[in-house]
């Protein structure tokens, strides 16, 4: 389901995965096999979920890597759409004409 203004996926990691377990960022980073700085950047919205991180999150907290990457994609698209007036494009063709 697409959200108009989705939260940064790092916020979801913090609020829905790390905090309910009573983990510190350092403890969660150790369990995920990443540096404290890498996880801190993610949960504070300074970094996104990479394919590798999506696998780590999937193994640690469940769900699938695709779900984690989907959250990241929705967030990234929503951020890009906030500046669509800055994106200048001339239409080339419609999708159905290209896919044939």
Where are these regions (language model features)?
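The DNA-recognition helices of helix-turn-helix-type DNA-binding domains
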Residues: 35, 46, 61, 72-75
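Short alpha-helical DNA-recognition segment
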Residues: 22-41
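Short, charged recognition helix plus adjacent turn
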Residues: 69-100
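Short, basic-rich loop-to-helix N-cap that marks the start of a DNA-contacting helix
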Residues: 46-59
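A short, Lys/Arg-rich alpha-helix, primarily the initiator
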Residues: 1-23, 70
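Hydrophobic side chains within well-formed alpha-helices
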Residues: 9, 64-65
């Amino acid at each position: 389901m697409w959200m108009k203004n989705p939260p940064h996926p790092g916020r979801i990691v913090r609020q829905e995965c790390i905090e309910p377990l009573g983990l510190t960022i350092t403890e969660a980073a150790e369990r995920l096999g990443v540096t404290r700085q890498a996880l801190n950047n993610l949960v504070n919205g300074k970094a996104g979920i990479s394919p590798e991180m999506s696998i780590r999150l999937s193994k640690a907290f469940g769900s699938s890597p695709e779900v984690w990457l989907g959250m990241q994609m929705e967030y990234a698209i929503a951020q890009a759409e906030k500046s669509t007036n800055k994106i200048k494009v001339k239409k080339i063709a419609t999708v159905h004409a290209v896919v044939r």
